Amino acid sequence: MYDQVTLGLNVDPFILSALKEDITSEDVSTNSVMPDSTPGVVDLICKEDGIICGLQVFERVFTLLDPSTRAEFYVKDGDHVENKQLVGKIYGDIRVLLCGERTALNYLQRMSGIATYTSQVAALLEGTGIKLLDTRKTTPNNRIFEKYSVRVGGGNNHRYNLSDGVLLKDNHIGAAGSVAKAVQMAKEYAPFVRKIEVEVENLDMVKEAVEAGADIIMLDNMTTEQLKESIDYIAGRAEIEVSGNVTKENIARLTGLGVNYVSSGALTHSAPIMDLSMKNLHPVE
């Protein structure tokens, strides 16, 4: 789980990799029109309503290129912003502002998009007592940014990586031979402080998971009727998570059923970006 402090401690290798992807040897466009260092300033402008997220990462792109670059933000992560709003100003060598522009905006747009979409989904669960969770369906090498964005948007992080908890999915069950066998083996291997979660797809698997002593049962890709039947059978003997193609458009059907958690891969794999841009770049004395 990452907050602004731990995010700042871990992002540099990923940002440097992104910069190296975009600036292999030089920025030939910038160097052709700006051969010498010239101080400048540029506006960061929001082009649609949403939740801003990733300002620290945005600024870090530029300070990795030149530590003297500085940003002046008028909002903070988690704030609601509106179309045409001035979010901040960035001061530094014009060559640095131009070289880092696309990489910095890519992070900010992606992170703000995830935070915005998550906030919209979380609003649909407000007052229900259901926790909204993300998944590991993230962009490779961007998980730290995407899971942080989910939290900023009002969601909660499920496992960050495979070391964080036991989640026995269909292929684990297939490898073990049965739900009961998979749960038994996990209980024998995992430390006693770790909860055992198992993914099930039908009532027979639900029954097996309950009898095996699973701590959390994930009801995957079930119809509303199957969910009701499964929840009635579990009857409080395990925590309940619902998953499987959960989106902003269909999550409302899961309220009022008595589930503890709803996980949605859409928070990270289907959130549209939020449109932001850097405008009005000009030299300063």
Named regions from a protein language model:
Residues 2-212, 216, 225-233, 239-241, ...:
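Acidic/glycine-rich phosphate/pyrophosphate-binding loops and surrounding catalytic core
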Residues 248:
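Cys/His-rich Zn2+-binding cysteine-cluster or related metal-binding knuckle/ribbon modules and their
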Residues 272-281:
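Structured adenosyl-cofactor binding patch, chiefly the S-adenosyl-L-methionine
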